[in-house]
Amino acid sequence: MHPDFAEDPRNVRLGLCSDGFTPYIQASATPYSCWPVIVTPYNLPPDMCMTKPYMFLSCIIPGPSNPTDGIDVYLQPLIDDLKRLWIGESTYDIAKKENFTMRVALMWTINDFPAYGMLSGWSTHGKLACPHCMEHTKSFNLKKGGKASWFDCHRRFLPANHQFRRKRNLFKLETTETDGPPPKITSYEVFNRVSGLWRFPDVGKRTRYDGYGDTHNWTKRSIFWDLPYWKDNLLRHNLDVMHIEKNFCDNILHTVMDVPGKTKDNEKARMDLKLYCKRPEMELQLLQNGKYLKPKAIYSLTSDEAKSVCHWLKELRMPDGYSSNLARCAGVKTGRLRGMKSHDSHVLMERLLPIAFCSLPNHVLNPLTEVSQFFKDLCASTLRIDELVKMDQNIPIILCKLEQVFPPGFFDSMEHVSVHLAYEALLGGPVQYRWMYPFERFMGDSKRTVKNKARVEGSICASYLHRETSHFCSHYFNHLMLTPKSTRNEVIDECERSMWILSVFRPSGRPFGAQREYWMNDAEMQSAAVHVMINCNEVGPYLEYFQRLNVGDIFTCFSEWFKDQLEKVASSPQIEHLRALANGPRRMVKEWHTYFVNGYKFHTKSWTMGKKTINSGVYVKGVSDGGEDDFYGVIKHIFELSYRYDNNVVLFYCEWFDPTNNGTKINPKHKNVDIRIDRRYNSFDPFILASKCSQVYYVPYPSHHRAKQGWCSAIKTKPRGEIEKEVPDIEVPYQDDEMSHVSNVIEIDPVTNLVDKDVDGSQIDAEVLEELLNNNEDDANNSEDNDEDRHIHEEDNEDDTYFNDE
């Protein structure tokens, strides 16, 4: 579109974020909302992109209230600068020692849903809230609930021959679906629509044009359209995956755990169910005593089951730095989860949700698991186009499967916009460059710099200028001075050693803690020696020759055969090292309780006892891609073996779980791995090279699910390191390295029953029900109108407390 801009890689691409937060550490009686505008460049290596030193505070919109549609008034100086930078500014290139004309373009904005409406000009409230569907949406206002619902708005995204389209009463009452998906409106079409609108509405006021809320949701012409290239951008405003995932997760948790006042399956939802669906067994039933019976839904837990889930979460242990303290969110006595931050919901949604609700029937659990897998794949640090296309096809089916189970009140704007996330990922790439986690942490730092509450914005500006000046000047000093403290799970760099050192002896990690001596017995000596030999690259040709000869078992015969072969070869430095390897290690080895390697922090099983975190789980990848020959275990000892010529190698002595079907089960669809924790591997092969290990943790199932007792779900973790470096980074949102193999969702679980007949429903007084009907206020947990821009950031912009047990 702009080849002259693209041909020079030195031209800068920017992203912009603006969001409101309360600039006080402690709660204040007077609400105050401050809006910083943050700009970040994308022309950086992945480990530097969107980090705090490269997030620039361009302006601050003062409080005490949010600027609503008048935010463009404050953005006008920034837009003027961006227009000038698009033309170009003379800049010195230090690498080429020359001046060049540097140009800058703003790629997109990153905001939560309310701020999305302020910056784009399309209001994100009401039944037309979706900025992709716009006026082509089929959402409607619930008559009893009084809020917008996107129930039965996703069948139109399905293939034309899909069976769901023909179901008359499985979704909306007496309704089939023949329409296709809403058209994708181009940037030029949007520009033509907003050209006649006002640019600068009054600050703090909203402008309503004719047809607002019925045929459109435009409130203004956004100031970003003043940028000459803005109408050429395919993705102008990002849907924030962080807040969408949190709201989706909260709705699931509150509904399944039947939290009073927050569940989407309340009395109003049951009354709306009668109007819009054919589910008579779920409707409120008038009893002879004048009260109404609310049948117990099959998708909700009983009070005891909810308490069991909270107790399970309170006792859950995960690796250091993996998550914040989830135990603080679990109310065991009440059976509720409270005070969950965005990253807590992130971990719960993508990792723990299918385990927590494993007792639900398949037609409820399977779509919840598919939602969990969808966000897990979407949030991977590496995305593949073919897999994103499958995800874009799968998510409408998943939402339709949820619509068969949950009431219309469950489906608000947050559930609906998830249908557009895979498409935005196709346009914009991985979500770690388009979500709000880095900006929330930046605002959390800004909050802690406020010293003068009477001059909030001035305090933030002064502190930011000091930080920016210090970081700029630090580039003129030694690079080592830029890192004032050691980073998590730091490992040593490879040191200068002999060029003849064998690959297996090259250092890869560092121990921590007190050192002890351990004397290995004969069986341990033989197993350790053979394991080191067969994992040495230089021994590979000998090992292949030994296997072709078929002269015996590797663990019993290879060591002596290898010695004999080396005696026939002329001496050289490498051969001498191989002979030292063949002679085996010393019987006395060094032992530690902690070891850092591959970006992981490993503990022995005994060292983790009594701690809030657990780092003893280990996983070794097998040869096949299906995971059938993978090994899972726990670390019993951490040994350093010593050989001649001052060569050392670190081994983990592990207790391996039974890899057969009796001890390890792999879900063929979702690839979840379950381990029977009381079954062990029969063969004596306990050792594994520390450099070849990955970390897992084992999550037991809640106690109320009797069929899963004794089994744990093995969850793999990712090393918390910088990209392509050995030095781990600070706290960042958890992501998988790559997407799982995304398969098309074709299995349709029949909905056999929606009512739990084994549990009595709750009775409601007629007076209470009448009072609810007379109350025209929306549900307290309405996601589209939950004052997200006022209070949710008080949680999210504070750094989570990541547990570290030494």
Located regions from the model:
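Acidic, serine/threonine- and proline/glycine-rich intrinsically disordered low-complexity regions
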Residues: 3-6, 181, 202, 506, ...
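Short, conserved interaction/coordination micro-motifs, predominantly
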Residues: 11, 244-247, 278-281, 285-288, ...
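Long alpha-helical repeat solenoid scaffolds
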Residues: 303, 314-317, 322-382
